[in-house]
């Protein structure tokens, strides 16, 4: 997996994702095998994402390494791998939980995030990420610092629970 570092203020949409992919210099991407300049578009898959505007289906680009044959999805940093809930929403839910606030209020800006989604985010945080953040003194906000710290210490996006290799590409938009 390759995560593109994007600014927090960019709204997550198919058109924004397509812009990121179309402006990407593929020869600058590095495969998990360590080689650069060998990744080519391999295909696409669809995944559901829940945003401020409701749910939508995002068509995600996959690339393949011509050297080792591994494939990688390319995701913006605003998405948590293997989750429908965006990073900003996850962090708000966790922040509200940590502060003793009504956890459902965090979802008011996300019409398709329900109570089960909230419970899942909190459960994943407590099981996989709470002690990691404490041990490295990592804070939830600002998101850009959180992303950098999690990749630096754990080679993973915050709230990523599958131990799939994930490389951060410093693309800024």
Provide a role label for each language-model segment.
Residues 19-21, 28, 46-47, 112, ...:
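Intrinsically disordered, low-complexity regions enriched in small/polar residues
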Residues 69-158:
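Short, positively charged, Gly/Tyr-enriched micro-motifs
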Residues 1-12, 26, 131-173:
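Long C-terminal interaction/binding lobes of large macromolecular proteins
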Residues 7, 18, 53, 96, ...:
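Acidic-enriched, low-complexity/disordered segments with a strong bias for Aspartate over Glutamate
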Residues 48-50, 119, 127-130, 162, ...:
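Context-gated lysine
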Residues 1-79:
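Short, conserved DNA-binding cores of transcription-related domains
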